[in-house]
């Protein structure tokens, strides 16, 4: 088993044992199983999949870092939401607004900000859509 802790600036989002996780890193998806080699990695905005026994749970992570050592996983994130905490209607509305803002963005700074908002909205939507499959 792995001991997973997800820590945001204002709260501990997750603190329990899990069987496996799949992270969105800056280099792509990464699966973590028990006895994984020690690792420090940057996390991209995306969905983390968590396997508890035979069921999976999802969490939208808004970037951060993960450390893995001796079956202890500590994830420090800017923000995180469990799929059960996300309102599907609000997530869909936010995604549509972010998509529209991205197409209208002008200038480098506005485009970067719009792209980050789009990635955050997409991660939240993916976290709940994966759950509903």
Swiss-Prot record:
Highest rank taxon of the organism: Eukaryota
Q: Where in the cell is it found?
A: Plastid, Chloroplast thylakoid membrane
GO molecular function ontology, one term from the record: ATP binding
Alphabetized UniProt keyword annotations: ATP synthesis, CF(1), Chloroplast, Hydrogen ion transport, Ion transport, Membrane, Plastid, Thylakoid, Transport
Q: How does it assemble?
A: F-type ATPases have 2 components, CF(1) - the catalytic core - and CF(0) - the membrane proton channel. CF(1) has five subunits: alpha(3), beta(3), gamma(1), delta(1), epsilon(1). CF(0) has three main subunits: a, b and c.
Give the matching HAMAP family. ATP_synth_epsil_bac
Q: Which family does it belong to?
A: Belongs to the ATPase epsilon chain family.
Name it. ATP synthase epsilon chain, chloroplastic
| Gene (name only) | atpE
């Amino acid at each position: 088993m792995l001991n997973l802790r997800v820590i945001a600036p204002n709260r501990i989002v997750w603190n329990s044992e899990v069987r496996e996780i799949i992270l969105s890193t800056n280099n792509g998806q990464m699966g973590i199983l028990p006895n994984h080699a020690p690792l420090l990695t940057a996390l991209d905005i995306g969905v983390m999949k968590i396997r508890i026994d035979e069921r999976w749970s999802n969490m939208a992570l808004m970037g951060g870092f993960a450390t893995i050592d001796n079956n202890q996983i500590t994830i420090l994130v800017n923000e995180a939401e469990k799929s059960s905490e996300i309102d599907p209607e609000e997530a869909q509305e936010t995604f549509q607004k972010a998509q529209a803002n991205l197409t209208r963005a002008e200038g480098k700074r506005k485009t970067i900000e719009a792209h980050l908002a789009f990635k955050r909205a997409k991660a939240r939507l993916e976290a709940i859509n994966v759950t509903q499959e």
